[in-house]
């Protein structure tokens, strides 16, 4: 090993040591274990007041805290929830597949009992502020003329019943 390689490796180990000490500090408890640049930018923005912290209450009553920029849309929040839940699942149980298409077609987010359905809506425009609580709520997507979609099984049985009469 050349002396230049040794210096780089020594510096890398020293940096890892300093970073682990910093991340162990209780003040930085909200920093993820392996933060991305966007995580750091959001946390800095939170300190400056240009981001907000939200509590997302899941159907089982547990909650998770997320930080989003003040200009974030509902779509941004959904992506952040997906990322956070996937990270938590990975840390707790290894990889477990969650069908987010299924989740968002059967549930929606709500704030103050108001269903949040427009993915392009800016969170602040729909009344979400710093420290707001957002909850999952059962939701059936409507199809066409204002009628709720029906499960295919029921349609099948109904058509069988009509032909036997």
Swiss-Prot record:
Top-level taxonomic group: Eukaryota
Subcellular location: Nucleus
The entry's keywords: mRNA processing, mRNA splicing, Nucleus, Ribonucleoprotein, Spliceosome
Region of interest called Disordered, as start-end residue ranges on this chain: 145-165
Keyword Zinc: no
A Gene Ontology cellular-component term: spliceosomal complex
GO biological process annotation, one example: mRNA splicing, via spliceosome
Start and end residues of each Ubiquitin-like domain: 52-137
Alphabetical list of PANTHER family matching this protein: U11/U12 SMALL NUCLEAR RIBONUCLEOPROTEIN 25 KDA PROTEIN, U11_U12 SMALL NUCLEAR RIBONUCLEOPROTEIN 25 KDA PROTEIN
Subunit structure: Component of the U11/U12 snRNPs that are part of the U12-type spliceosome.
Name of the molecule in the record: U11/U12 small nuclear ribonucleoprotein 25 kDa protein
